[in-house]
């Protein structure tokens, strides 16, 4: 197969591993800088150009689109879909998963366990919003934040009011969530490919920190997940329409709660923790399910 990898940086661990795994299995792997791809939108035959040449003959595309380039990245991916190239994850599903609030609304509608979450626009509604999620301590999140940036734990209601008013004053969209104390600063990253959790790891926040992101100094270890956690991760990925996803789950007193569904999960932490060839499993998924003109949405939506 001829497989495109949409990535800003060919030296990133995840990009490198996907290229290695594809080549090991005899595929032609081409890394394309997402922001250097350009297209004629109105042409009769959908096309993408890259460094002066048309991109042709691809069977599948692996999007590794960073949060900051979601809009342009999804436009490029949509064009690939319109050309009949099979996407590992579809543009619609990626755009959906990048909108944190919409993701939670979709997951909630399907009855998937979530922390109590509030959303408001006006500072006048802050006291009621805090009460809605059960009071302090609580977590405030910027909707545009990634890798734990823009996530604040407020120990008191006074602190929560100050932080909320500051964010709202800066015209940021924020959501407020109950703090799951019993999770003890740990979460579980379940790596879903197709309809299977192929690997999972526990991420523990550094001492004095509550955010378990590895980018924030958290540590990772092996963990055995329960059947309920496995099913929750698979269902969450399915609701979002993602073939490959990193589903972050908290263990609470009332079962697994989904924190986030990531459409472009990193491979370094999960591969080094579990010793599994995740990149190889992703390529095998493409071999089994990919191929020209198998894109479900064909770039619509």
UniProtKB/Swiss-Prot annotation:
InterPro entries: ATP-grasp (IPR011761), ATP-grasp_RimK-type (IPR013651), ATP_grasp_subdomain_1 (IPR013815), RimK (IPR023533), Rimk_N (IPR041107), Rp_bS6_RimK/Lys_biosynth_LsyX (IPR004666). Mn(2+) 2 binds at residues 260, 262. This is Probable alpha-L-glutamate ligase. Mn(2+) 1 binds at residues 248, 260. GO terms for molecular function: ATP binding; metal ion binding; ribosomal S6-glutamic acid ligase activity. Keywords: ATP-binding, Ligase, Magnesium, Manganese, Metal-binding, Nucleotide-binding, Protein biosynthesis. SUPFAM superfamilies: Glutathione synthetase ATP-binding domain-like. ATP binds at residues 141, 178-179, 187, 211-213. Its EC number is 6.3.2.-. Pfam families: RimK (PF08443), Rimk_N (PF18030). Mg(2+) 1 binds at residues 248, 260. One of its GO terms (biological process) is SOS response. Residues 104-287 form the ATP-grasp domain. Belongs to the RimK family. GO terms for cellular component: cytoplasm. Binds 2 magnesium or manganese ions per subunit. It comes from the Bacteria. Disulfide bonds: none annotated. HAMAP family: RimK. Its cofactor is Mg(2+); Mn(2+). Mg(2+) 2 binds at residues 260, 262.
């Amino acid at each position: 197969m001829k497989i495109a990898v949409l990535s800003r940086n060919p030296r990133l661990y995840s990009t490198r591993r996907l290229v290695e795994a594809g080549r090991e299995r005899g595929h032609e792997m081409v890394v394309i800088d997402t922001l250097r791809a350009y297209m004629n939108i109105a042409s009769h035959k959908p096309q993408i150009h890259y460094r002066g040449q048309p991109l042709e003959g691809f069977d599948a595309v692996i999007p590794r689109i960073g949060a900051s380039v979601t809009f342009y990245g999804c436009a490029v991916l949509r064009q690939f879909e319109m050309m009949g190239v099979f996407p590992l994850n579809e543009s619609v599903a990626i755009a959906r998963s990048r909108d944190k609030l919409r993701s939670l609304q979709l997951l909630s509608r399907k009855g998937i366990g979530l922390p109590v979450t509030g959303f408001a626009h006006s500072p006048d509604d802050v006291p009621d919003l805090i009460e809605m999620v059960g009071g302090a301590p609580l977590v405030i999140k910027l909707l545009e934040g990634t890798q734990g940036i823009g996530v604040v734990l407020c120990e008191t209601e006074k602190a929560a009011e100050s932080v909320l008013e500051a964010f709202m004053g800066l015209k940021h969209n924020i959501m407020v969530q109950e703090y799951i104390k019993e999770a003890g600063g740990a979460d579980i990253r379940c790596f879903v490919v197709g309809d299977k959790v192929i690997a999972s790891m526990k991420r523990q926040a550094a001492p004095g920190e509550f955010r378990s992101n590895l980018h924030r100094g958290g540590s990772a270890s092996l963990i055995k997940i329960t059947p309920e956690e496995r099913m929750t991760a698979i269902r969450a990925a399915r609701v979002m329409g993602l073939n490959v996803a990193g589903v972050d789950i908290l263990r609470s007193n009332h079962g697994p709660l989904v924190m986030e569904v990531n459409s472009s999960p990193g491979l370094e932490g999960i591969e080094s923790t579990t010793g599994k060839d995740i990149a190889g499993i992703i390529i095998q998924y493409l071999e089994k399910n990919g191929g020209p003109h198998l894109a479900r949405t064909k770039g619509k939506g």
